[in-house]
A protein has these predicted regions:
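N-terminal glycine-rich cofactor-binding segment that shapes the pocket for flavin-like pterin cofactors
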Residues: 1-445
Length: 445
């Protein structure tokens, strides 16, 4: 996130942390170069557009502790980081609930052009009532209705990206004074339940046309959405839970005519790696000392919509009243052998990364655990959560990456081409994807 802390809250107080420099171009340029040196596929930027104000019914804790606030726009970082790298992809979170499809599609096409095909979009529908109020609405749509609206948004975006301009529309013929052939640019007319448009798209086709699509919905409706639209999907929980989720989403995607090879699943985790196990555990203890349990629980309150400050710290949470809380408690209860959860235990769990289990140890130990996740959970990769910046990433690049490369389980060099080509071997979405039905064809003209 374009702020001082996103999930492992409070670590901005660590004396070696440089996240206060998030306001500078130097910070992001150095981070991008470090990740490319380590062969990372993508730098992922989460985002919110409202305040975490559920804890105690106000945003005070989030403001005091820097819980995703203040936060700057993530999209504007991409051209800067693309300029100092050649291969690193950039996944940017944008909440479609408050976007105009026509203008948003142009912004993403622009990023894809400027990055030479390295743009990705993490599709979210939002969870903060404060975001709805900030956008002039009294409240959010209901959970499933937000996904219904997102489906309509995607249909229009696909029409713009995939169906308005033919690949050979731009000829740039100086002698004939023809830059774009009008017969190769097609009007988009969309009359959906939430969005309407009558336009030709503003941007010529970018290297990927549609950016690589990320998504993280864990509900049944969210998994249906992922099965239809997403290419890269975030999962969480234990290995068994992640494997079950992956199998479920894959089955839904296959039912829509897609394949497992069309999908990449990433599990979120915190990695603390040292030259030895003792060094890593000492560093992990140091991180926990600087972390803020209250900040973590303020964040979790916003995610679930439940103000945990109202509860007795030692009273068991027996009847979770939101799906988000129910899913979280099922996840952590399985990991803890069925122990009862209280707000006090949640406070401890929230210190570093909430539902994301830290992996702590030497490079060999961490590599063993990552390989275990791939083997047992069927994940394709990892969404590594920052802790103390920049050392959390330089440690991974300098200690863990060489170990993974020595084992032959991590690339030694990048494959040339777009981000989608690096991940899937093709620049454009396959014909099996929902977007393909919106491509221009002479028969439909």
């Amino acid at each position: 996130m374009n702020c001082i802390g996103d999930i492992a809250h409070g670590l901005w107080t660590h004396p070696r942390d440089d996240s206060r420099a998030y306001r500078t171009s130097r910070y992001w340029a150095e981070l991008a170069r470090t990740l490319e040196r380590g062969g990372f596929d993508t730098l992922f930027l989460a985002d919110i557009i409202g305040a975490n104000d559920v804890w105690e019914g106000r945003p005070d804790a989030a403001l005091r502790e820097g819980v995703q606030h203040p936060i700057n726009d993530p999209l504007l970082l991409v051209p800067l980081m693309a300029h100092v790298t050649e291969h690193l992809g950039f996944g940017v979170t944008v909440n479609q609930s408050y976007e105009v499809p026509h203008l948003f599609a142009r912004r993403m096409s622009t990023l894809d052009h400027l990055s030479e095909g390295r743009a990705a979009w993490n599709i979210v529908t939002g969870f903060l009532d404060s975001a709805a109020r900030a956008a002039g609405q009294t409240q959010q749509l209901g959970h499933d209705a937000r996904y219904d609206r997102a489906d309509d948004f995607m249909a229009l975006a696909y029409k713009l990206w995939e169906g308005s301009w033919e690949d050979d529309a731009v000829v740039h013929d100086r002698a004939a004074r023809i830059h774009t052939r009008p017969d190769k640019v097609h009007r988009i007319r969309h009359e959906g339940p939430y969005y309407q448009a009558d336009t030709i798209f503003l941007s010529e086709p970018s290297p990927q046309r549609t950016p690589v699509l990320f998504q993280a919905g864990a509900s049944k409706r969210g998994m249906d959405f992922a099965a239809r639209h997403a290419e890269c999907i975030f999962v969480s929980g234990t290995k068994a839970q992640a494997r079950e989720t992956i199998a479920d989403i894959t089955a839904r995607a296959v039912a829509l005519g897609r394949r497992r090879a069309d999908l990449r699943f990433f599990v979120g985790t915190i990695v603390v790696v040292g030259a030895t196990e003792a060094e890593a555990r000492e560093r992990f203890a140091e991180y926990r000392h600087h972390a803020s349990p209250e900040a973590g629980l303020a964040h979790f309150s916003a995610q679930t919509g439940i103000d945990f400050s109202r509860f007795d710290l030692d009273a068991p949470i027996t009847n979770p009243d939101t799906q988000a809380l129910k899913s979280f408690l099922e996840s952590v209860t399985t990991r803890s052998g069925g122990q009862v959860w209280t707000p006090r235990r949640l406070l401890d769990q929230m210190v570093l990364g909430s539902r994301h289990t830290p992996i702590v140890g030497s490079a060999e130990q961490v590599a063993d655990e990552l390989e275990s996740w791939v083997r047992e959970a069927d994940v394709d990769g990892f969404n590594l959560i920052r802790t103390v910046v920049p050392e959390c990433f330089t440690d991974i690049v300098d200690l863990l990456v060489p170990e993974l490369r020595a084992r032959g389980v991590y690339k030694k060099a990048y494959t040339p081409g777009t981000l989608r080509h690096k991940l899937f071997g093709t620049d454009r979405l396959p014909d099996r994807h929902a977007a393909a039905s919106f491509r221009f064809s002479p028969a439909s003209a």
